[in-house]
């Protein structure tokens, strides 16, 4: 790997010769492949991982793989049964389980593509609400897709800049800021990041990162947690920024209990508790994380919450599709189900933010029908008996995921039918007798026409 000379000089000075040589060798190695199981969907199964190469030690659901299978052609990936994620990013699971033990309102500020958001949602106590935000429109749509595949109803996805949150009137117990960075930790995966690197870019990122934290700081409750992370190695974006947050905003830095044999590196400039993942030393890509607490001042509460709207006739015909207590909101023909416990938060958010997903998208009104949405198919709140189900094999599942026409058994009821693979919901079709209309979202479809002759999947499921 041909690293920029300035990067070598700067990083060697920071790390010292021995640690830098470990990093340099690690960057030449093949990146480890890891997945994280979705406990919302796999907890009732015995899960076998044929390519397993050990557990990710800081995350119970994380598993290393011996090699990288072709994930695209595994229907269980599309069902949300697991997520392909770099192992270091799963460290968030440990942080949250050590510090969050009651229901909270959390914001993942720079959330796309959604890996850390789904880690957070799995670790959050029941009754918590997760806001996942991404400023870039295209990336926000990817984030919304992954949140919907994960399948938890207590999530909102927004497409806003951090400063926009200051006008909402919502205070957060936890803010995760995985801030945009110079990307040194991605050198091994993305050679384009090497070409874009410069010390000038590092300085720009450092300034932007602190601006982001200053923008969102008023939205963090007194006593609330800020989890600051980057995917870079340099101290300017890491230790120096954390120390600036401590000095300027009077934050308290908090330790995370870790094991020595995980080979996580601490701060490279002082003895404050910070956590750095270095390829070659830790089995991961580059990651830096620190946990800070906002000083406790006078209590700040979210504004008075709005009452849920009354149910109209359309809603009364579909509320049996979900288990739980929901408020139903109709907008331009689209029906959303918002858990009533946090409908007030939703009502504040939708007035001031660009909300692109919230709760469960039930479907779209078309004539007398509500065409059920993919969000509904994949959500754990969907009632087992809400729709007729048809179990399909792998070949048919891949055809469905390509949005191709598929054949159903002759005794399949007419109307909307939920297709399942290994009993995991994949999505809806509308059976009209002589054919079934494929309702899989066009933008989610598998675009490759390749059909693998043999593909070892990441996981297999067996009933308990």
Predicted segments with their positions:
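Polybasic, low-complexity RNA-engagement segments
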Residues: 1-46, 285-288, 295-464
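Conserved AdoMet
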Residues: 31-90
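Conserved class I S-adenosyl-L-methionine
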Residues: 102-112
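Conserved SAM-binding loop of SAM-dependent methyltransferases across substrates and taxa
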Residues: 113-126
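Helix-to-beta-strand junctions that scaffold the AdoMet/dcAdoMet cofactor pocket
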Residues: 125, 220-222
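S-adenosyl-L-methionine
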Residues: 133-170, 177
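Mobile active-site "lid"/loop adjacent to the S-adenosyl-L-methionine
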Residues: 138, 173-214, 231-238
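Class I S-adenosyl-L-methionine
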Residues: 172, 225-228, 232-344
């Amino acid at each position: 790997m041909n690293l920029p000379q300035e990067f070598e000089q700067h990083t060697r000075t920071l790390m010292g010769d021995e640690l830098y040589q470990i990093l340099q060798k690690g960057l030449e190695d093949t990146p480890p492949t890891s997945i994280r199981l979705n406990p919302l969907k796999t907890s009732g199964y015995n899960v076998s991982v044929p390519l397993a190469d050990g557990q990710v030690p800081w995350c119970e659901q994380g598993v290393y793989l011996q090699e990288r299978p072709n994930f695209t052609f595994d229907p269980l990936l599309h069902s949300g049964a697991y997520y392909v994620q770099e192992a270091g990013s799963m460290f968030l699971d440990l942080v949250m389980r050590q510090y969050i033990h009651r229901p909270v309102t959390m914001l993942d500020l720079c959330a796309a593509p959604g890996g850390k958001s789904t880690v957070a949602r799995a670790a959050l106590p029941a009754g918590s609400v997760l806001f996942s935000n991404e400023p870039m429109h295209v990336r926000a749509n990817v984030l919304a897709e992954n949140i919907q595949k994960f399948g938890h109803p207590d999530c909102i996805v927004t497409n806003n800049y951090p400063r926009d949150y200051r006008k909402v009137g919502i205070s957060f117990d936890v803010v995760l800021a995985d801030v945009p960075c110079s990307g040194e930790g991605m050198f091994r995966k993305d050679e384009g990041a090497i070409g874009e690197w410069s010390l000038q870019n590092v300085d720009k990122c450092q300034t932007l990162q602190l601006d982001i934290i200053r923008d969102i700081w008023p939205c963090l409750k007194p006593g609330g947690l800020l989890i600051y992370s980057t995917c870079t190695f340099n101290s300017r974006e890491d230790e120096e920024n954390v120390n600036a947050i401590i000095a300027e905003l009077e934050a308290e830095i908090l330790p995370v209990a870790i094991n020595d044999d995980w080979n996580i590196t601490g701060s490279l400039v002082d003895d404050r508790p910070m956590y750095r993942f270095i390829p070659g030393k830790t089995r991961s890509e580059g990651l830096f994380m620190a946990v800070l607490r906002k000083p406790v001042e006078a209590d700040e509460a979210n504004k008075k919450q709005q009452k849920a709207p009354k149910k109209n006739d359309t809603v009364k015909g579909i509320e049996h599709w979900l288990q739980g207590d929901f408020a139903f909101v109709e907008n331009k023909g689209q029906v959303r189900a918002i858990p009533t416990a946090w409908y007030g938060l939703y009502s504040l958010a939708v007035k001031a933010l660009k909300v692109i997903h919230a709760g469960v998208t039930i479907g779209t009104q078309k004539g007398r029908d509500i065409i059920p949405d993919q969000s509904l198919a994949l959500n754990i709140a969907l009632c087992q008996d809400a729709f007729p189900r048809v179990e399909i094999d792998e070949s048919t599942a891949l055809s469905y995921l390509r949005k191709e026409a598929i054949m159903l058994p002759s005794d399949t009821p007419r109307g909307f039918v939920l297709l399942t693979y290994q009993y995991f919901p994949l999505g809806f079709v509308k059976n009209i007798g002589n054919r079934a209309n494929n309702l899989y979202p066009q933008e989610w479809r598998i675009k490759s026409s390749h059909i693998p002759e043999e593909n070892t999947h990441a996981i297999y499921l067996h009933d308990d």
